[in-house]
């Protein structure tokens, strides 16, 4: 009799994805982040579900309901801070996952890569709408500033913004619909994750060398299940340290002030994980130009398969490309720092130079360096 896990239609799916899946024997810890992202998504959905049971999406009571969760609900404080800091862990894993894909040429699997970009946009949209829900000062003004960017779209911009707001300013209708979408999107993300995995399992995983590994595969279980469990343990430990010792480290103190449309905070800034894009947005004096640069800063990832000029897939044996990659990482860290600074000298010019360098590296320098490497290797 065949083993039930190989014959039962449901168990067979799980078996082929998590147990008998052939995996390259040499994938490093950089390949752990896919499973870590899955765990992050699960943590966010579970904590979010319990928070939604106590939250009210009304401008009059939203702020109070969050306070009520933290003070009166059993373990409500840990739910709230797990959810808020879980988002930060989610983005740390996301950025490392995308960085791994760039470094090792995983974007050559175009379908998997493009679904991944869709996932990135969906997670960013979810995080933005979630940040609005506590209805603090930064929630309100962040929502006002970011939704207002759509008014830069020619002809339909103003109508579009008012349609999204459900009125002439960010108000009750906006908060209610943001809550509805914030609840809905994680389930859409879950569906996209399944599609992402479906495409990945069509081709199999890439590996650090970028060389096909069909002749040297090992079963996913027990080798990579135990490896993923170690990664999960480290991540959960880091998350718990953050939640239990300094839960407000990554938040903005202004969000402990209830939303007030008559009082603008001195520095409006998003959560840390959006600062790099916010810095690019602010670097361009023109509104429409800034919005386009903001969208393109993420959408440019879709061009990566077209910009791959090297004859090798991975950067493992390409020292010049490695220099460009780490320059890009340093540039993104600079942009993140600039995004949190006030708009004044010297931060303006640093932000503009970092923004130019970001696009220059991806569109010009990295493809050029790859061509140079091909010639150096006489290929």
UniProtKB/Swiss-Prot annotation:
Gene3D superfamilies (UniProt xref): Cytochrome Bc1 Complex, Chain C
Cofactors (names): heme b
GO biological process: mitochondrial electron transport, ubiquinol to cytochrome c
Cofactor note text: Binds 2 heme b groups non-covalently.
GO cellular component: mitochondrial inner membrane; respiratory chain complex III
Family matches, as InterPro entries: Cyt_b/b6_C, Cyt_b/b6_C_sf, Cyt_b/b6_N, Cytb/b6-like_sf, Cytochrome_b, Cytochrome_b_C_euk/bac, Cytochrome_b_N_euk/bac, Di-haem_cyt_TM
Example of a GO MF term: metal ion binding
Membrane-spanning residues: 33-53, 77-98, 113-133, 178-198, 226-246, 288-308, 320-340, 347-367
Annotated residues for binding of heme b b566: 97, 196
Family annotation (Pfam families): Cytochrom_B_C, Cytochrome_B
Localization (cell): Mitochondrion inner membrane
Membrane topology: Multi-pass membrane protein
Positions contributing to a ubiquinone binding: 201
Keyword annotations: Electron transport, Heme, Iron, Membrane, Metal-binding, Mitochondrion, Mitochondrion inner membrane, Respiratory chain, Transmembrane, Transmembrane helix, Transport, Ubiquinone
Function: Component of the ubiquinol-cytochrome c reductase complex (complex III or cytochrome b-c1 complex) that is part of the mitochondrial respiratory chain. The b-c1 complex mediates electron transfer from ubiquinol to cytochrome c. Contributes to the generation of a proton gradient across the mitochondrial membrane that is then used for ATP synthesis.
Quaternary organization: The cytochrome bc1 complex contains 11 subunits: 3 respiratory subunits (MT-CYB, CYC1 and UQCRFS1), 2 core proteins (UQCRC1 and UQCRC2) and 6 low-molecular weight proteins (UQCRH/QCR6, UQCRB/QCR7, UQCRQ/QCR8, UQCR10/QCR9, UQCR11/QCR10 and a cleavage product of UQCRFS1). This cytochrome bc1 complex then forms a dimer.
Additional observations: Heme 1 (or BL or b562) is low-potential and absorbs at about 562 nm, and heme 2 (or BH or b566) is high-potential and absorbs at about 566 nm.
Family the entry assigns: Belongs to the cytochrome b family.
Matches recorded under PANTHER family: CYTOCHROME B
Name under which the protein is recorded: Cytochrome b
The species this protein was found in: Ptenochirus jagorii (Greater musky fruit bat)
Gene this protein is translated from: MT-CYB
């Amino acid at each position: 009799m065949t083993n039930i896990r190989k014959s039962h239609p449901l168990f067979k799916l799980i078996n082929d994805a998590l147990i008998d899946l052939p995996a390259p024997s040499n994938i490093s810890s950089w390949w752990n982040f896919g499973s870590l992202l899955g765990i992050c998504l699960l943590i966010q959905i579970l904590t979010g579900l319990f928070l939604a049971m106590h939250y009210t999406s009304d401008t009059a009571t939203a702020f109070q309901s969050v306070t009520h969760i933290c003070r009166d609900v059993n373990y409500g404080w840990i739910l709230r801070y797990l959810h808020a800091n879980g988002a930060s862990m989610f983005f740390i894993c996301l950025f490392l996952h995308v960085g791994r894909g760039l470094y090792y040429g995983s974007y050559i699997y175009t379908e998997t890569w493009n679904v991944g970009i869709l996932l990135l946009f969906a997670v960013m949209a979810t995080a933005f709408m979630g940040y609005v829900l506590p209805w603090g000062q930064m929630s309100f003004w962040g929502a006002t500033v970011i939704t207002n960017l759509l008014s830069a779209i020619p002809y339909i911009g103003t109508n579009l913004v008012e349609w999204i707001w459900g009125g002439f300013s960010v108000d009750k209708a906006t908060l209610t619909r943001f809550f509805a979408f914030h609840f809905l999107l994680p389930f859409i993300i879950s569906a996209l994750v399944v599609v992402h995995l479906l495409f990945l399992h069509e081709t199999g995983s890439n590996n650090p060398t970028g060389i096909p590994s069909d002749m040297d595969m090992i079963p996913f279980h027990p080798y990579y299940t135990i490896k993923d469990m170690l990664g999960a343990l480290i991540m959960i430990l880091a998350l718990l340290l953050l939640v239990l010792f300094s839960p407000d480290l990554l938040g903005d103190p202004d969000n402990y002030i209830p939303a007030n449309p008559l009082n603008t905070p001195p520095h409006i800034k998003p959560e840390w994980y959006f600062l790099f894009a916010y810095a690019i947005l602010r670097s361009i004096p023109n509104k429409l130009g800034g919005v386009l640069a903001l969208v393109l800063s993420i959408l440019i990832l879709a061009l990566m398969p077209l910009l791959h000029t090297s004859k090798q897939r991975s950067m493992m044996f390409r020292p010049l490309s490695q220099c460009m990659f780490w320059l890009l990482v340093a540039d993104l860290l600079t942009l993140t720092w600039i995004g949190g600074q006030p708009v004044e000298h010297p931060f303006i010019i640093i932000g503009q130079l970092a923004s130019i360098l970001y696009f220059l590296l991806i569109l010009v320098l990295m493809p050029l360096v790859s061509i140079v490497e091909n010639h150096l290797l006489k290929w």
